[in-house]
Amino acid sequence: MAQYVVCALYKFVALEDFEAIRQPLTDVMEKNKIRGTLLLASEGINGTVASTREGIDALLAWFKQDQRLTDVVYKESFDENQPFNRTKVKLKKEIVTMGVEGIDPRHVVGTYVKPKDWNALIADPDVFVVDTRNDYEIEIGTFKHAVNPETESFREFPEYVEKNLDPEKHKKVAMFCTGGIRCEKSTAYLKEQGFDEVYHLEGGILKYLEEVPEKESLWEGECYVFDGRVAVDHQLEKGQYSVCNACRLPITDAA
């Protein structure tokens, strides 16, 4: 039975005192033997951590003490081993780096689509489906009908939009990512660029894999995750990939 709970979490929220939050957050993580990395910025919090059930519950309880973080978005999966080596709380300019000033998902964002409704949306031929993740993530798994922007980092996404998407041509755009945070910013960016009907998968791929039965799923392959598991399968269990020691990209011995 899996011993560790892996918790991916984020929330876009005004945290003017984010620098002051760093130490008490580090303290609660260390006290409860929670490993992983959390990012703090004036726009919110983001990261993935792992611990025992009790440790993760203690962290979530700590968030509830701050009314700004009581409804932090989180998704859980499990691993037999601790997938992280260290405990880190970092201060950043953005909790997910797009590099474009003024994009604020708290003020404008696309339409959330529940996992149970996602299949019907992306099967619609009038909907242009974009995977907002990096190229190496997409190579090991993505949704049917999805376009690969072939980006190496999220910073390249605005350039992809500028060169390849047109509000007059692409009337309906649906986007997805691992846990939902990149889609928050990417849909906010598209709305700012004049796109009207913009949708994104609520809770990301991880929530979809959790809620949609595999026999009904339009997901193909495995889902890359930013921890020692490298990828998870449709049951959210560690997949067949490992990390190449030379290039640091996911590899598999499977035929």
Swiss-Prot record:
Q: By what name is this protein known?
A: tRNA uridine(34) hydroxylase
A GO BP annotation? tRNA modification
State which gene encodes it: trhO
Keywords, ordered alphabetically? Oxidoreductase, tRNA processing
Similarity annotation: Belongs to the TrhO family.
E.C. number: 1.14.-.-
The record, for InterPro entries, names: Rhodanese-like_dom, Rhodanese-like_dom_sf, TrhO, TRHO_N
Molecular function (GO) terms listed? Answer: oxidoreductase activity, acting on paired donors, with incorporation or reduction of molecular oxygen
Stored HAMAP family: TrhO
Active site annotated at which positions?
C177 (cysteine persulfide intermediate)
- Segments forming domain Rhodanese: 123-217
